[in-house]
């Protein structure tokens, strides 16, 4: 019986070495160690052994069972590791394959121009002020020297929500709100960028567009200060050789008022299609803050003065990039936008 046990052990170990799958290993376990396995069947005949043989055969049987179980456990671990390596090899990512291409985004040309304008004025010591786009009639018109019966209100087609609430037509209300908050402190030196709304829609107008307005209030502010600031802005925005000129104009909230032109950067002032032969391009409106506006905001116009200016960001972008139709900026056509 001892020899039969050792022979079965050798057969079982040889079978385990050739097994390649967990299923094959389980079949070997059942064949030799199962309830009806060969080792189990052989051990059932131990009752026929003599008292002297039984302990010795029992010890050999335990050794055989233990050796088969240990070999089975070790082989099972190796088979699982081999299967894992095979699976990893089959699922390995080929790092040489090209990945999916994602287009790189970029800032919208209006955002680029807006940030450039802000950067220039911040370099001149201005701070950024913001306010609500849904505004009161008082701040949008009345506090800017535009009472309800003023004919200049016709210059701006307005989106009214109700008789006293509207979508702001310019960012000037931010200036009034800032003055009310700061009074009687000076100086005030702010720019007010943001969206504004008017009932216009054609090649050069949009019902929603962007403005940057500026305000300076302090003692002894003069028109020369206004001219110096805007000339510096024009040179930094359009080139150091850019010239500026101021033409008399009218705005209810400034007195005196002026339109600001720059020398055409396309023809250097000689006349071309861009400037319509004049050599000049209009870029913004400006003027000294009207005494009534200062007074309504809480300042004494006898003690402080100020200047204000305002420009359309779309207008600046169209001039800077040679865009002839405002609507191109809002069509979201990547073929157009990717040029900037």
Curated annotation (Swiss-Prot):
The EC category is: ligase
Q: What's the main place this protein lives?
A: cytoplasm
Sequence positions that bind Mg(2+): 255
Q: Which reaction does it catalyse?
A: tRNA(Phe) + L-phenylalanine + ATP = L-phenylalanyl-tRNA(Phe) + AMP + diphosphate + H(+)
UniProt-listed InterPro entries: aa-tRNA-synth_II, aa-tRNA-synth_II/BPL/LPL, Phe-tRNA-synth_IIc_asu, Phe-tRNA_ligase_II_N, Phe_tRNA_ligase_alpha1_bac, Phenylalanyl-tRNA_Synthase, tRNA-bd_arm
Cofactor detail note: Binds 2 magnesium ions per tetramer.
Q: Pfam families, per this entry? A: Phe_tRNA-synt_N, tRNA-synt_2d
The places in or outside the cell where this protein is found are: Cytoplasm
What does the record list as GO biological process?
phenylalanyl-tRNA aminoacylation
Q: Which UniProt keywords apply?
A: Aminoacyl-tRNA synthetase, ATP-binding, Cytoplasm, Ligase, Magnesium, Metal-binding, Nucleotide-binding, Protein biosynthesis
PROSITE patterns this protein is in? AA_TRNA_LIGASE_II (PS50862)
Any one GO MF term held by the record is: magnesium ion binding
Entry's family note? Belongs to the class-II aminoacyl-tRNA synthetase family. Phe-tRNA synthetase alpha subunit type 1 subfamily.
Its quaternary structure? Answer: Tetramer of two alpha and two beta subunits.
Q: Which protein is depicted?
A: Phenylalanine--tRNA ligase alpha subunit
């Amino acid at each position: 019986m001892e020899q039969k046990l050792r022979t079965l052990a050798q057969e079982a170990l040889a079978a385990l070495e050739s097994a390649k799958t967990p299923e094959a290993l389980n079949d070997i376990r059942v064949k030799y160690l199962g309830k009806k396995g060969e080792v189990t069947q052989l051990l059932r005949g131990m009752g026929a052994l003599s008292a002297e043989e039984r302990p010795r055969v029992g010890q050999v049987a335990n050794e055989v069972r233990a050796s088969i179980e240990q070999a089975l456990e070790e082989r099972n671990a190796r088979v699982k590791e081999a299967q894992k390596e095979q699976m990893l090899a089959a699922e390995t990512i080929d790092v040489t394959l090209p990945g999916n291409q994602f287009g790189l985004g970029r800032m919208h040309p209006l955002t680029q121009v807006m940030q450039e304008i802000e950067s220039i004025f911040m370099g001149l010591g201005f701070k950024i002020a913001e306010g609500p786009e849904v505004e009161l009639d008082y701040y949008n018109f009345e506090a800017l020297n535009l009472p309800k019966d003023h004919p200049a209100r016709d210059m701006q087609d307005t989106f009214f929500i109700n008789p006293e609430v509207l979508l702001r037509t310019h960012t000037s209300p931010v200036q009034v709100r800032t003055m009310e908050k700061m009074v009687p402190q000076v100086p005030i030196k702010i720019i007010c960028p943001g969206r504004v709304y008017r009932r216009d829609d054609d090649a050069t107008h949009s019902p929603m567009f962007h403005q940057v307005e500026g305000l300076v209030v302090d003692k002894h502010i003069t028109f020369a200060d206004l001219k110096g600031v805007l000339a510096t802005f024009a040179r930094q925005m359009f080139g150091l050789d850019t010239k500026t000129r101021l033409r008399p104009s009218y705005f209810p909230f400034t007195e005196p008022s002026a339109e600001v032109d720059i020398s055409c950067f396309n023809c250097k002032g000689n006349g071309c299609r861009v400037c319509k032969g004049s050599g000049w391009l209009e870029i913004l409106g400006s003027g000294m803050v009207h005494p009534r506006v200062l007074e309504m905001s809480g300042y004494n116009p006898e003690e402080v003065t100020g200047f204000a200016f305002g420009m359309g960001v779309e207008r600046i972008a169209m001039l800077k990039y040679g865009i002839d139709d405002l609507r191109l900026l809002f069509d979201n056509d990547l073929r157009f936008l990717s040029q900037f």
